């Protein structure tokens, strides 16, 4: 009996580090996927215009998991958001806050293929709203399908005034897509798993409460190289 108790204690001791290591595994994998998606998409010259990337305050990436012909639960997915640091979004890119995407239309059929979503948050109001609470696209924040091409000159005024520009990639095809009616929100439960403590999304972005985790270093380094400076009108950042 004593031998069994000793063996059980040893198993518990060994299992502890394994459980801790796997606790944030999903979030770590998600961040690595976000980095791959952003680089693959932004390295293609005729996809997201560089001038829009340079004027974005934040970028949200959702690597989606598909079940059958629909997004799982016909509702949404999980991803991450990075922003330019500082009160006025003028600093280097931040550590990520984990995000949720909810309320996708059940009619969003994609033939069983994985679909990635990339959202550009184009002004401070939109960024602060998303960091504060859940935001319904098209209602709480104006949203539009993002334009493609080397620049955004051909985009409509409605598109250029949107607080959030949305893109999708499925079957290797990349396009602007409307996500109006969907909800984006910080996933604070995932943040706690990733960082090992309770954190508010605003603390991560504005206060630099945590360092960039290893799984997100490629994503953040790539964005700092791709778009090191916010080129928005300084007056719009106040």
Task: Walk through the language-model features, giving the residues of each.
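Positively charged n-region of N-terminal signal peptides that target proteins for export
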Residues: 1-4
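Bacterial N-terminal signal peptides
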Residues: 7-16
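Small-residue-enriched, tightly packed secondary-structure blocks
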Residues: 21-238
